[in-house]
């Protein structure tokens, strides 16, 4: 990313504005200092110290958007778009940004869509007392967007049910890559391999794949088989 690229909802500013009302009214130069890459890297290294309670409360503050303690961060995003020029259409990388998306849709008068990608896992990781409220807030804000884009019909149907969304709100577009400029390898390996390209975590089934690979190797019928993973 460009060094001049603005940072929105920087972790330090979000935490301070969530915890202390004083930081909801600080001048821009202070916010910019807290958004320095050096400080954010330091904070990221200590992210494991955030308690489940803090995570739940900050999630609710973020989802509340303009109606919560992080309204200053929402306005920063809106101001940036007004200064740079409104896009013809806006795609949110995740529907968890719907609280911001609904504001941009209303104030910029543009269509806004959100991608569905693993929000169920995040919601399930919250403590029960925060999970219910977070789901309600998300359901309300996502319904105000022009629609959602799911990587599969299964996940689209799952999230539509969880967030009480109309089926017409969900569009399906499978993940993939453009292969037009990719040429076949000239030197094809003589031994076969299993490939995995996704997030390296049990939620994606990587542990099951590894167990299956071990069983294949132990069978004695696939001595030359290798497992190649990336993500």
Placement of each model-derived feature along the sequence:
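A short, histidine- and acid-enriched strand-loop-helix "catalytic/donor-clamping" loop
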Residues: 64-66, 98-99, 114-131, 144
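Short N-terminal targeting/anchoring amphipathic segment
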Residues: 78-97
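Active-site proximal beta-strand in glycosyltransferases
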Residues: 89-91, 104-122
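A short beta-strand/loop micro-motif in the catalytic core of glycosyltransferases
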Residues: 91, 143-153, 228
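Carbohydrate-associated surface elements
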Residues: 154, 176
